[in-house]
Amino acid sequence: MARVCQVTGKAPMVGNNVSHANNKTKRRFLPNLQNRRFWVESENRWVSLRVSNAGLRLIDKKGIDEVLADLRARGEV
């Protein structure tokens, strides 16, 4: 699927634009996705991921090795 974070699974959600007159029209809220390369020291190679900003923060917190292990356990990488 397009526009889905590979780490967190965040995807677009649907909501409303609300005008001053309280008119509502449908819109999509897109996740803040970034294409990033991460150096994996244990494999001695670069890994490219499409991650949201929340996914980047999770990688900073847990480390790329642990996040990649979770992705491989889910069968996504």
Swiss-Prot record:
SUPFAM superfamilies: L28p-like (SSF143800). InterPro entries: Ribosomal_bL28, Ribosomal_bL28/bL31-like_sf, Ribosomal_bL28_bact-type, Ribosomal_bL28_sf. It holds the Pfam family Ribosomal_L28. Keywords: Ribonucleoprotein, Ribosomal protein. Signal peptide: none annotated. GO terms for cellular component: cytosolic large ribosomal subunit. The keyword Ribosomal protein applies. One of its GO terms (molecular function) is structural constituent of ribosome. The keyword Cytoplasm does not apply. It comes from the Bacteria. GO terms for biological process: translation. NCBIfam families: L28 (TIGR00009). Belongs to the bacterial ribosomal protein bL28 family. PANTHER family: 39S RIBOSOMAL PROTEIN L28, MITOCHONDRIAL (PTHR13528), LARGE RIBOSOMAL SUBUNIT PROTEIN BL28M (PTHR13528:SF2). This is Large ribosomal subunit protein bL28. The lineage of its organism: Bacteria, Pseudomonadati, Pseudomonadota, Betaproteobacteria, Burkholderiales. The gene is rpmB.
